[in-house]
Amino acid sequence: MKNKNPIIIVEGIDRVGKTTLCNMLSEATGFPIYKYDESVVSYDKMDNDNETDKMRQLIKLHELTNAGGVIFDRFHMSDFVYGILNRKYCTLHARDNLLLIDSDLSAAEAIVILVDPVDIKYSSDMHGSDLSMHCLFFSYAFLKSKCCTLATDYNHLDACVNCVKELIE
């Protein structure tokens, strides 16, 4: 895979180093980071179909603009996991939408990185609630992906950056 216009997605539960990895990847590649602005997004009004539609539009926009790579700090897997566990999405419908977006991402040769917790109890304590189920749902989504996938944890972020650089250069 030598994609000069890659989509790189960093996923995982809260408090595992996703944003740190995104910043490291951006520094190493020069690609911008896209992250929802939480001061603008109202999570209680999020709907799985709307989120799916927005994500598919972002993928298409990236393809059309051919503006170089982009790094997403959370994307379709986060919507799937947090949507089911925190926003009452219908599980089967959310799974279908997850697979639909994953198919689009696979066609775009996206790289999906799952940042696993080094210590689930620590991540849960820092978050303020148990994230064990979230971790399991991320694992499910990650295993279902047809994209180029990498798994890492906070202790191996440098190695992950090197792997991504090898994939895109």
Model-derived features with residue positions:
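Short, solvent-exposed loop/turn segments at secondary-structure junctions
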Residues: 14-16, 76-78, 117-120, 155-157
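Conserved substrate/cofactor phosphate-moiety recognition/catalytic segment
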Residues: 13-16, 20-69
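A mobile, often basic/glycine-rich helix-loop segment
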Residues: 80-98
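Hydrophobic anchor at the beta1->P-loop junction of P-loop NTPases
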Residues: 10
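Walker A (P-loop) ATP-phosphate-binding motif of ABC ATPase nucleotide-binding domains
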Residues: 7
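Conserved P-loop NTPase "ATPase switch" module shared by AAA+ and STAND
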Residues: 68-80
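NTP-dependent small-molecule kinase module
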Residues: 2, 126-169
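Conserved phosphate-donor/acceptor-positioning beta-strand/loop module used by diverse small-molecule
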Residues: 73-75, 93-123
